[in-house]
């Protein structure tokens, strides 16, 4: 049954690259076979409940710009929001969605009321998933918006806040499991510090390690089969966040013995804030064996902060999905659009148009990445660049020779290496041919 919010807009269909219909896919064809698998199953698109239905269009200099009938802290408004959200999911045709607890329920007076509200909405989600075929990619707890978390959740100096946050995560894992969620995400927006003058760094890291260990322990206790994911971000809202980037998260996981239990959910915008490319973070996660899922968006190239815009740069997406394919593709993860409308984009159809453009951009990137992989366009030059290490001397350097033996061979054989071109321009031109 239609809520009327989207008017007479019909379900979005694939019409091909020649279509000029703004409410149709030009490149995302869910059933198209890419590398032996349906495009839908490669990309595993998800809609973010928070940006799509909870964000009000405000910024640091101005308040709400969006006029949505569900903007109130009442359970009936939350139910209307759920109706509109699932209508949107059905119109768009993305197979998954993601949510924080605070996105979907009103803020209660205490933990018990929050839990009751959440369970009431989960009852509704269960029915709607059965009716629509929608699936939950991941759930998470909002441990950063409420003022109780101003000094962190897992890293808060007050043990009562730690306990409240842990109890909240428990209820959110329960909800995620009940809805068949395939992952559970932890993002530490307030896990960090504004100044070291009032921060016990060692204690806070240990507390965060304890918190994550509790999550993993509970996952196994209740038989939740999904993947636990950490989402790295270097700053914003906190000046310095402990889950700075993939490398930092990996070091943290190793320190607390959790590297085989937890993977990463990598967001493009967060990678940029950390001084990396999206491609870099994906490649490193793949190399370290902790790649899990992605939050797809982009930052404004000029502003220098996390703007969460819909992706529109196909070469960037081609290189990103190239790394995803090298990792073997998604298992429990997927492509969640952690992207929001601009605050002047007021019309309901803008929400569809933003997602359609993002899905088309990702589809083009995936197809380009698949062709590069099939043709060996990047792997062949890479193999040539490192070919010397496959020879007898290269193998001995890595496994048999001591430092003094290496020095002896360099002198005896008069080894005098000359640099070879890295061919960066050639490789960049190859990528552009495929996109």
Curated annotation (Swiss-Prot):
Its EC number is 5.3.1.5. GO terms for biological process: D-xylose metabolic process. It comes from the Bacteria. The keyword Transport does not apply. InterPro entries: Xyl_isomerase-like_sf, Xylose_isom_bac, Xylose_isomerase. Its cofactor is Mg(2+). GO terms for cellular component: cytoplasm. It is an enzyme of class 5 (isomerase). One of its GO terms (molecular function) is xylose isomerase activity. Keywords: Carbohydrate metabolism, Cytoplasm, Isomerase, Magnesium, Metal-binding, Xylose metabolism. The keyword Transcription regulation does not apply. It catalyses: alpha-D-xylose = alpha-D-xylulofuranose. Mg(2+) 1 binds at residues 231, 267, 295, 338. Homotetramer. Belongs to the xylose isomerase family. PANTHER family: PTHR48408, XYLOSE ISOMERASE. This is Xylose isomerase. It comes from Brucella suis (strain ATCC 23445 / NCTC 10510).
């Amino acid at each position: 049954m239609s809520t009327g919010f989207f008017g007479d807009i019909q379900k979005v269909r694939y019409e091909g690259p020649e279509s000029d219909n703004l409410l149709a896919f030009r490149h995302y064809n869910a059933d198209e076979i890419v590398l032996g698998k349906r495009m839908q199953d490669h990309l595993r698109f998800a809609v973010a409940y928070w940006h799509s239905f909870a964000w009000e269009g405000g910024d640091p200099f101005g308040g709400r710009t969006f006029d949505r009938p569900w903007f109130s802290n009442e359970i009936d408004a939350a139910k209307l929001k759920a109706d509109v959200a699932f209508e949107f999911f059905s119109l768009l045709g993305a197979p998954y969605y993601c949510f924080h607890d605070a996105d979907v329920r009103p803020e209660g007076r205490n933990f018990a009321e929050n839990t009751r509200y959440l369970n009431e909405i989960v009852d509704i989600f269960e029915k709607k998933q059965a009716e629509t075929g929608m699936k939950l990619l991941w759930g998470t707890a909002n441990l950063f918006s409420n003022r109780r978390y101003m000094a962190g959740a897992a890293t808060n100096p007050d043990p009562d806040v730690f306990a409240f946050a842990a109890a909240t995560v428990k209820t959110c894992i329960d909800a995620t499991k009940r809805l068949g969620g395939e992952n559970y995400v932890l993002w530490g927006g307030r896990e960090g510090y504004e100044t070291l003058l009032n921060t016990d760094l060692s204690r806070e890291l240990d507390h965060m390690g304890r918190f994550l260990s509790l999550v993993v322990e509970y996952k196994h206790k209740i038989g939740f089969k999904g993947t636990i994911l950490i989402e790295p971000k270097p700053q914003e809202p906190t000046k310095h966040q402990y889950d700075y980037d993939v490398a930092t998260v990996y070091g943290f996981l190793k320190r607390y013995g959790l590297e085989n239990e937890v993977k990463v959910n990598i967001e493009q915008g967060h990678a940029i804030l950390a001084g990396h490319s999206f491609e870099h973070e994906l490649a490193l996660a793949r190399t370290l064996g902790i790649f899990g899922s992605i939050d797809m968006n982009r930052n404004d190239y000029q502003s220098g902060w996390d703007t969460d815009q819909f992706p529109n740069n196909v070469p960037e997406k081609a290189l990103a999905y190239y790394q995803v394919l090298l990792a073997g593709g998604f298992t429990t993860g997927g492509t969640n659009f952690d992207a929001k409308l601009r605050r002047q984009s007021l019309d309901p159809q803008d929400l569809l148009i933003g997602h359609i453009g993002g899905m088309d951009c990702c589809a083009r990137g995936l197809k380009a990445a698949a062709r590069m992989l099939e043709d060996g366009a990047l792997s062949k030059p890479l193999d040539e660049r490192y070919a010397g290490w496959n020879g007898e001397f290269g193998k001995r350097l890595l496994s048999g020779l001591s430092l003094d033996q290496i020095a002896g061979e360099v002198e005896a054989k008069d080894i005098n290496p000359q640099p070879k071109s890295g061919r960066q321009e050639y490789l960049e031109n190859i990528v552009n041919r495929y996109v």
